[in-house]
Amino acid sequence: MSMLRIWSCIVHFFSVQALDSRIKPDIEFKRRQRIFINSSKEENGSSSSAVTVTRNPVLSSNSPSPPLWNTWEFRLYYLAFTVVVPFMIKAALATSSESNPNYYKFSGLLAHGWILGRKVDNSDPQYRFFRSNFFLLAILILLQIILKKVFVKFSKIPKTKFDFACGLVFVCFMYGINSVKLFTHAFIFFTLAHSLKRKRLIAAFAIWSYGIFTLFINQKMKNLPFNNIAIILSPMDQWYKGIVPRWDFFFNFTLLRLLSYSMDFLERWHEQLSRQPSIDYDDRRPEFRKSLSGSTLQTIYESGKNVLEEKERLVAEHHIQDYNFINFIAYITYAPLFLVGPIITFNDYLYQSENKLPSLTKKNIGFYALKVFSSLLLMEIILHYIYVGAIARTKAWNNDTPLQQAMIALFNLNIMYLKLLIPWRLFRLWAMVDGIDAPENMLRCVDNNYSTVGFWRAWHTSFNKWVIRYIYVPFGGSNNKILTSFAVFSFVAIWHDIQLRVLFWGWLTVLLLLGETYITNCFSRYRFRSWYRFVCGIGAAINICMMMIINVYGFCLGAEGTKLLLKGIFNNSHSPEFLTAVMVSLFIAVQVMFEIREEEKRHGINLKC
């Protein structure tokens, strides 16, 4: 294999196209590219004329700039990367070294590791649970995949019916007797949606109100004994509690599926109602069932070239009878995506249960499995050598340099990113092997973000898509940006955790987002000026600092810890030199981020993040 071929494989491995089959050049880009190529051939009388998308006038103002990778400017940036990045890693290692005066403060949180006799930072309770149960989870994954393939092949039962039975067993195994609480919520959602279906606004209000109410009631009553509900239920307190006693911990993801089913059902019901208003619709009447069969099913259950794209699958016209209780339970308890997602809408799940997407090839799945393994290995290496999680929990950074304290914050954000990315990718891989292609949740590395808007789009992408479909668009979308932004981030904050700190995080994010949008609009008129990219780089560097502070406050250190960390960074004799170096380094990093996105545009990819 030639070096060029190897380099091409490496570039593809780290590209966004390798993450998700949904990411591909849009049709309009391909059409414009063909027009430009044909026009160039006509002008030059030869197909060998130089044609590059980067100079394509057909793409007008949206066309990417000429490549900068081989310019002297970027060669200086490469040199800076080879110096700065190792220096950052060295500083992070120094904070975790046994020779560090603060080591004794956090050493008690370290466990015995498996890499070269090193200890491992296993202090994060969420990732510790995942790490401790990884091999059990691997056995469950293999068991579910094998059983489903055997049952579906030999019994010819629909996949959704197997998912229904498997989901019930899986939830009971995970939650034990506490699964009764989850299914009680599910039954109430199903009842509200179907009993109030003729009054869509009332139904939507009732469903959303109850959905938000469940977040609060679960917080208050998560450990409520059955004995407190009724004396006759007291024996249930001694029954099997499952391997996840905190059943409420993962309920938030189930809530998204409960809301998705309810909203999709109401939307489909009223679409049918508006098309044939003369019929008294009752889903229990045989003539109603008959009237809704036929061409609709043939249209949406067509594979091959006519397979529906993601946006079409979200509003696929399923038979109204497909919104039944069995499919409802199969969807909300679908084992591969049950615990933490990624989130897939009910309409999309139902469509993919009947139609295997062409993207689910052995090559794509194998390539994605390699990415999952690489992420796991990277996380293990970091946890064995950089103990910033334990340091943050004990606030053990006294007398560390400003750079070392900044690395504690940065690597904490990276660990938070990886601890979310790994389960999401593992469960998505499980779903892909099972025949369901859920959205990729992490389109960008946490260190490859300079925009609040872009960060929100690329971080937890499936949740972002869910929010756009069920909150952002119904509230008016971009026509009412301030209201929709506060509605979205208030829900996001409450959904994450019912704490005032997280709610403040949501509101701070909104303010940063609105400020970024305003400044971007003010400067967009100058986008063709030679200095525009450099001014944007300065603004993006400042924006990165703000995003780091907000997210460290919201999800890592809280108010007191963030205050202490910032005090240590800024209240130091070397702070001015350090902050100058930080801004220069971030500016260089941002220029590379800009060029990565421009390179994607040259291939017709514009993720807007």
Swiss-Prot record:
Segments on the Cytoplasmic side according to the record's topology features: 97-133, 191-200, 346-371, 428-474, 524-533, 597-609
Signal peptide positions on this chain: 1-18
GO biological process per UniProt: cellular hyperosmotic salinity response; glycerol transmembrane transport; GPI anchor biosynthetic process
Induction conditions: Expressed constitutively.
Keywords: Endoplasmic reticulum, Membrane, Signal, Symport, Transmembrane, Transmembrane helix, Transport
Database matches in InterPro entries: MB_O-acyltransferase (IPR051085), MBOAT_fam (IPR004299)
Subcellular localization, as worded in the UniProt entry: Endoplasmic reticulum membrane
Any one GO molecular function term: symporter activity
GO cellular component, as recorded: endoplasmic reticulum; endoplasmic reticulum membrane; membrane
Transmembrane residue ranges: 76-96, 134-154, 170-190, 201-221, 325-345, 372-392, 407-427, 475-495, 503-523, 534-554, 576-596
Record topological domains on the Lumenal side: 19-75, 155-169, 222-324, 393-406, 496-502, 555-575
Active site: 496
Membrane-topology descriptor: Multi-pass membrane protein
Principal subcellular localization: endoplasmic reticulum
Record family assignment: Belongs to the membrane-bound acyltransferase family.
Summary of the function given for this chain in its UniProt record: Probable membrane-bound O-acyltransferase. Together with GUP1, has an influence on the chemical composition of the yeast extracellular matrix (yECM) in yeast multicellular aggregates, such as biofilms and colonies.
UniProt-recorded name of the protein: Membrane-bound O-acyltransferase GUP2
The species this protein was found in: Saccharomyces cerevisiae (strain ATCC 204508 / S288c)
